[in-house]
Amino acid sequence: MGNDIIANMITAIRNANLGRAETVEVPATNLTRNIAKILLREGFIESFSEHQENKNSFLIFILKYRGKKRKPYITTLRRISKPGLRIYSNYQEIPRVLGGTGIVILSTSRGIITDREARQKQVGGEILCYVW
């Protein structure tokens, strides 16, 4: 069994949301950095920073909650394309999550982008995950 970096990151964020944790720590790779930038830009996380200890670098996400009950902004994170079953889509067939409320994160020839950017640039790719 190989390492699925995206699934590990999604699981860490999901578990932290369930426990109402302030921060989450995930290994830093180019892929996780790019996904973190998208989550920050779309308003799903408060911020993130990169730290290094003993040649191991990792990202620390500060999660975003709303209201007195501290409901998480990220209600669902779902991995779509998996190492055993890759899912690809052209720009015309990219699914809309919750009628456009959520986002689809794609890996394209132009980098890691959201579904809106992919439609705008008319580029398809591998559907990594849904966020809403």
Swiss-Prot record:
Gene Ontology molecular function: rRNA binding; structural constituent of ribosome
Annotated compartments: Plastid, Chloroplast
GO biological process, alphabetically ordered: translation
Keyword RNA-binding: yes
Alphabetical list of SUPFAM superfamilies matching this protein: Ribosomal protein S8
Annotated Pfam families: Ribosomal_S8
A GO CC term attached to the entry: ribosome
Keyword DNA repair: no
Keyword terms, alphabetized: Chloroplast, Plastid, Ribonucleoprotein, Ribosomal protein, RNA-binding, rRNA-binding
Self-association state and partner proteins as the record states: Part of the 30S ribosomal subunit.
Matches recorded under PANTHER family: 40S RIBOSOMAL PROTEIN S15A (PTHR11758)
Membership in a protein family: Belongs to the universal ribosomal protein uS8 family.
Role summary: One of the primary rRNA binding proteins, it binds directly to 16S rRNA central domain where it helps coordinate assembly of the platform of the 30S subunit.
Protein's recorded name: Small ribosomal subunit protein uS8c
